[in-house]
Amino acid sequence: MRSTKVIHIVGCHAEGEVGDVIVGGVAPPPGETVWEQSRFIANDETLRNFVLNKPRGGVFRHVNLLVPPKDPRAQMGFIIMEPADTPPMSGSNSICVSTVLLDSGIIAMQEPVTHMVLEAPGGIIEVEAECRNGKAERISVRNVPSFADRLDAPLDVTGLGTIMVDTAYGGDSFVIVDAAQIGMKIEPGQARELAEIGVKITKAANEQLGFRHPERDWRHISFCQITEPVTREGDVLTGVNTVAIRPAKFDRSPTGTGCSARMAVLHAKGQMKAGERFIGKSVLGTEFHCRLDKVLELGGKPAISPIISGRAWVTGTSQLMLDPSDPFPHGYRLSDTWPRDE
């Protein structure tokens, strides 16, 4: 057996969404900050293509690279690689990374609660892990500041006509639309159609509405979040949502950044206040338990500090290798399993 590289991976999923973690075999990319390192990976694409493209990966998968932190407050940094993006932050991936760090012993576990500070490309996140019998059972993450951008904005979408949408940031940028507006329900049997429509809505939102983060160089809308109406019981709101991820797949989890963005919109519309909780439910019925912890400002914009909480499970370990005679050193994509990214 011969290989010019060996990458060590711990497999993991958070409430159904795959978020594998590279724990060895990759040197930290160049950059003075984790954000700059993530931009190198986004522009270079060599590593992302190797771990995500067939025959080693697939469109279903996200992969996280552990890197030494740049901020002295943090114990570890990580960079998220998605099929088409290298985002500032991800809720499900931060939960996977935290679980792998503790369950594998990379960071020492303290029972019943372990506190960590991690550095995502989008900023510092605080982690509280509930641990028992050597397992991180639930991860709570204080996400980066989140904010609503546009509320009730008209958007013209080919095949749908004019729909009303919100745009918001929850660690990544979203256009948010109610499922009823597009004549659909969030259920597994409509996953392909919803994902394709969601990507179409994202494209239209970038062309007609745009987005600009007040502090980061993030100038596009990444995802379409499709929602069903929120219900309230006391100080707890519950809502089903799903997120269409380019090129055209569904997030299997409730999407932590999406829940954060949705809470920011609910707060901006006067439907949620500090201290109240939000349960986000995925297309699979899994849940993230969230809280609008406090209200703040970000670059002069009203914002919130959200906390997201969920579970993750280690699924295995693997080693990715590259034989020097392999005709596909960067992998490949075919549209039967990897939708066209238009």
UniProtKB/Swiss-Prot annotation:
KW Isomerase (keyword) present: yes
Positions of the catalytic residues: S90
Reaction it catalyzes: trans-4-hydroxy-L-proline = cis-4-hydroxy-D-proline
Keyword Isomerase: yes
Pfam families assigned: Pro_racemase (PF05544)
Keywords: Isomerase
Binding residue positions for substrate: G91, S92, D251, G256, T257
A molecular function (GO) term: trans-L-3-hydroxyproline dehydratase activity
EC code: 5.1.1.8
Tree of life domain: Bacteria
Listed InterPro entries: Pro_racemase_fam
Disulphide bond pairs: none
Function: In vitro, catalyzes the epimerization of trans-4-hydroxy-L-proline (t4LHyp) to cis-4-hydroxy-D-proline (c4DHyp) and that of trans-3-hydroxy-L-proline (t3LHyp) to cis-3-hydroxy-D-proline (c3DHyp), albeit with very low efficiency. The physiological substrate may be different. Displays neither proline racemase activity nor t3LHyp dehydratase activity.
Family: Belongs to the proline racemase family.
Database matches in PANTHER family: BIFUNCTIONAL TRANS-3-HYDROXY-L-PROLINE DEHYDRATASE_2-EPIMERASE, TRANS-3-HYDROXY-L-PROLINE DEHYDRATASE
Assembly description: Homotetramer.
Protein name stated in the entry: Protein BMEI1586
Organism: Brucella melitensis biotype 1 (strain ATCC 23456 / CCUG 17765 / NCTC 10094 / 16M)
